[in-house]
Amino acid sequence: MLAKRIIPCLDIHNGQVIKGMQFRNHKVIGDIVPMAQRYAKEGADELVFYDITASSEGRVVDKSWIARVAEVIDIPFCVAGGIKSVAQAGEVISFGADKISINSPALNDPYLISRLADRFGVQCIVASIDTWYDIQLDRYQVNQYTGDENRTKVTNWQTLDWVQEVQKLGAGEIVLNMMNQDGVCRGYDLQQLRLVRQTCHVPLIASGGAGTMQHFQEALINAEVDGVLAASVFHKNIINILELKKFLAREGVEIRLC
């Protein structure tokens, strides 16, 4: 059995790490490189960096900080932010990123996923999906341009359909960003994760809602995800990564201990 992954998420804006709640009201948390170093030392298995306004602003993620991060950490990291071509992805990888995450650009150009997978291999291509549960319609909808609350829009894709589509196109991993739970710290949406798990045959990463160590355990065991991504509990020092891993190991989760 492959070890489960603990993945801190760093949302980037104007060269700094920020964090909001339900993808809104973002506040500055700290500087990129020191935070990346801290999480690597604490025992993170991987890091994810989202330049959250790159797509909505029509630009590509700033690559200068990518090189600085690559110099100071020795764990894999994934980068997202306005990547719309093989050439742009190649530049990000050349600066040190191990994986490319595609979100809004893939909704405009789904075959971008295929072109990237053909060039770099499916193991390098992550489909990041921002999913919102619409209570009135009683369904999960994919959202786009979520880094800017004034430009966020609901797409025509229902989440489960898009999960199936990105796999067909060549995504080697899926990160499910559950917007209703984001920053609330009340637990992952286990019902949605179970539904997605049934149709997801590549590694599935849960994102949005972690507030306690038990929340990580529930997602890993009850929803059978391959990894758990979180931000607030790590940024605010509510949970230490090494202590979290020790707890999960005691609970029977296959996990890498440093």
Curated annotation (Swiss-Prot):
One of its GO terms (biological process) is L-histidine biosynthetic process. It is an enzyme of class 4 (lyase). The active site is at D11, D130. It is found in: Cytoplasm. GO terms for molecular function: imidazoleglycerol-phosphate synthase activity; lyase activity. Its EC number is 4.3.2.10. It catalyses: 5-[(5-phospho-1-deoxy-D-ribulos-1-ylimino)methylamino]-1-(5-phospho-beta-D-ribosyl)imidazole-4-carboxamide + L-glutamine = D-erythro-1-(imidazol-4-yl)glycerol 3-phosphate + 5-amino-1-(5-phospho-beta-D-ribosyl)imidazole-4-carboxamide + L-glutamate + H(+). Keywords: Amino-acid biosynthesis, Cytoplasm, Histidine biosynthesis, Lyase. Pathway: Amino-acid biosynthesis; L-histidine biosynthesis; L-histidine from 5-phospho-alpha-D-ribose 1-diphosphate: step 5/9. Its main location: cytoplasm. GO terms for cellular component: cytoplasm. Belongs to the HisA/HisF family. PANTHER family: IMIDAZOLE GLYCEROL PHOSPHATE SYNTHASE HISHF (PTHR21235:SF2), IMIDAZOLE GLYCEROL PHOSPHATE SYNTHASE SUBUNIT HISF/H IGP SYNTHASE SUBUNIT HISF/H (PTHR21235). Heterodimer of HisH and HisF. This is Imidazole glycerol phosphate synthase subunit HisF. It comes from Baumannia cicadellinicola subsp. Homalodisca coagulata. The lineage of its organism: Bacteria, Pseudomonadati, Pseudomonadota, Gammaproteobacteria, Candidatus Palibaumannia.
